[in-house]
Amino acid sequence: MPLGRAPRIGVGGPVGSGKTALVAALCRSLAPSLRLGVVTNDIYTTEDADFLRRAGVLDPQRIRAVETGCCPHTAIRDDITANLDTVEDLEADTGPLDLVLVESGGDNLTATFSYGLIDRQIFVVDVAGGDKVPRKGGPGVTLSDLLVINKTDLAPLVGADLGVMARDAAAARGPRPVLFTSLTADPTAGDVTAWVRAQLADLSPHGPRGATPAAAG
């Protein structure tokens, strides 16, 4: 990671998988000890940024929006200029920051971030799509640094077998981690928060400001 800037973690996944809700949960959990910024992506609106501002998860000045005007994956992978400019302006206006979360617009299972934009990426799917989703693969499922299988509380309602999803995700991802979440059961997204803290400790030789060894482990 280049010196002089905050670590950046991308959050991607299909429409409705719970990306914005996860970003909100991470902000609530991390903001007491870390200085955060968020950049959201939507095609023609600022809907996700507006949601986060209304939820009061951060100072509104530290939440910025990119209107991509094109397929979401283009702005996070193929031409990252708008996102890079927005992240850099965010840091210049409100920094120093400990972490910037970059949320992609909703896309399909092929969407991934350019590592010219972010340092780590989380890919979010949800059980409402059925237990076949991890088996379908795609770069988002197979190559992301963390796969989050969200909305596990809905599994009984849609007939999704979490054991099958765990097996297929492990087969698709090898050693890369997979976490199952329900923001209804755990609004803090505790396991994902712990993973983020571990990445910050790994990316920064001194760890983020406010992090303790226990929290960053």
From Swiss-Prot:
It is found in: Cytoplasm. Pfam families: cobW (PF02492). Keywords: Chaperone, Cytoplasm, GTP-binding, Nickel insertion, Nucleotide-binding. One of its GO terms (biological process) is urea catabolic process. Transmembrane segments: none annotated. GO terms for cellular component: cytoplasm. InterPro entries: CobW/HypB/UreG_nucleotide-bd, P-loop_NTPase, UreG. GTP binds at G13, P14, V15, G16, S17, G18, K19, T20. GO terms for molecular function: GTP binding; GTPase activity; nickel cation binding. Coiled coil: none annotated. The keyword Chaperone applies. Facilitates the functional incorporation of the urease nickel metallocenter. This process requires GTP hydrolysis, probably effectuated by UreG. Homodimer. UreD, UreF and UreG form a complex that acts as a GTP-hydrolysis-dependent molecular chaperone, activating the urease apoprotein by helping to assemble the nickel containing metallocenter of UreC. The UreE protein probably delivers the nickel. Belongs to the SIMIBI class G3E GTPase family. UreG subfamily. This is Urease accessory protein UreG. The gene is ureG.
